[in-house]
Amino acid sequence: NVPENSRGPFPQQLVRIRSDKDNDIPIRYSITGVGADQPPMEVFNIDSMSGRMYVTRPMDREERASYHLRAHAVDMNGNKVENPIDLYIYVIDMNDNRPEFINQVYNGSVDEGSKPGTYVMTVTANDADDSTTANGMVRYRIVTQTPQSPSQNMFTINSETGDIVTVAAGLDREKVQQYTVIVQATDMEGNLNYGLSNTATAIITVTDVNDNPPEFTTSTFAGEVPENRIETVVANLTVMDRDQPHSPNWNAVYRIISGDPSGHFSVRTDPVTNEGMVTVVKAVDYELNRAFMLTI
């Protein structure tokens, strides 16, 4: 085993290979394989006389986690005196990589009025260190939430999966339309004293639901009806609706409940202003009807 990022000095001895016959005859040792005579070349070398094997430079586990070499022993004439042996060299991981979020900004949404426990989004960070050790085990936490309304803890995050869910009631789009949540990922199983960390931003948009009825701006509207004319707007009814403008939750639909038994009027919705346009659709005779009291 070789720890990565060793400071040396190099070359640094790893093992010594010896043949049982080296007391009887001179032996020459060599190694072959990736890291010796195959790229990357000469990461490892061996003293041909003593059999001492060395690493010549710092290792990087994230570049290569292990090496498989073969050691050979021959006599002075090049004749094999031992069968080649396999050498497996494993690079020991060090915590030298921070967790890296897949995205720096995540966008998610949640309906206003959602119950605690409602899923919002998932954030993910990867760590290049060994995931079977604490060096590569990432844990998540929420650092800040802006705004802190109606509570400073409107959301929580699963420390292992990165799933963000609501944890408190009170999401109201008409009060807070968007939250900015700073999320931190820390390796060493979330140990803030020893682990390496990184942060990302989660933008959570509170989506509108139809939780506000339209309200007339006044209880009485007045208008004048021209005699014997149709397709004329005689009154504009104004309403206020706190739901998201120009959404289905905001668009008003007007209906005449009473006061127009003969069907002289209809109320159409202005798609821009949401006003109700009281329109003459059947000609009115002044001599028969001098006034109408419509309930809408």
UniProtKB/Swiss-Prot annotation:
<protein>
    <recommendedName>
        <fullName>Cadherin-4</fullName>
    </recommendedName>
</protein>
<keyword id="KW-0479">Metal-binding</keyword>
<keyword id="KW-0812">Transmembrane</keyword>
<keyword id="KW-0677">Repeat</keyword>
<keyword id="KW-0130">Cell adhesion</keyword>
<dbReference type="GO" id="GO:0005886">
    <property type="term" value="C:plasma membrane"/>
</dbReference>
<feature type="glycosylation site" description="N-linked (GlcNAc...) asparagine">
    <location>
        <position position="107"/>
    </location>
</feature>
<keyword id="KW-1003">Cell membrane</keyword>
<feature type="domain" description="Cadherin 1">
    <location>
        <begin position="1"/>
        <end position="101"/>
    </location>
</feature>
<keyword id="KW-0325">Glycoprotein</keyword>
<dbReference type="GO" id="GO:0045773">
    <property type="term" value="P:positive regulation of axon extension"/>
</dbReference>
<dbReference type="GO" id="GO:0007157">
    <property type="term" value="P:heterophilic cell-cell adhesion via plasma membrane cell adhesion molecules"/>
</dbReference>
<dbReference type="InterPro" id="IPR020894">
    <property type="entry name" value="Cadherin_CS"/>
</dbReference>
<comment type="function">
    <text>Cadherins are calcium-dependent cell adhesion proteins. They preferentially interact with themselves in a homophilic manner in connecting cells; cadherins may thus contribute to the sorting of heterogeneous cell types. May play an important role in retinal development.</text>
</comment>
<feature type="domain" description="Cadherin 2">
    <location>
        <begin position="102"/>
        <end position="216"/>
    </location>
</feature>
<feature type="domain" description="Cadherin 3">
    <location>
        <begin position="217"/>
        <end position="296"/>
    </location>
</feature>
<dbReference type="GO" id="GO:0005509">
    <property type="term" value="F:calcium ion binding"/>
</dbReference>
<dbReference type="InterPro" id="IPR015919">
    <property type="entry name" value="Cadherin-like_sf"/>
</dbReference>
<dbReference type="GO" id="GO:0007156">
    <property type="term" value="P:homophilic cell adhesion via plasma membrane adhesion molecules"/>
</dbReference>
<keyword id="KW-0472">Membrane</keyword>
<feature type="topological domain" description="Extracellular">
    <location>
        <begin position="1"/>
        <end position="296"/>
    </location>
</feature>
<feature type="glycosylation site" description="N-linked (GlcNAc...) asparagine">
    <location>
        <position position="236"/>
    </location>
</feature>
<dbReference type="Pfam" id="PF00028">
    <property type="entry name" value="Cadherin"/>
</dbReference>
<dbReference type="InterPro" id="IPR039808">
    <property type="entry name" value="Cadherin"/>
</dbReference>
<keyword id="KW-0106">Calcium</keyword>
<dbReference type="GO" id="GO:0007411">
    <property type="term" value="P:axon guidance"/>
</dbReference>
<dbReference type="GO" id="GO:0048675">
    <property type="term" value="P:axon extension"/>
</dbReference>
<dbReference type="InterPro" id="IPR002126">
    <property type="entry name" value="Cadherin-like_dom"/>
</dbReference>
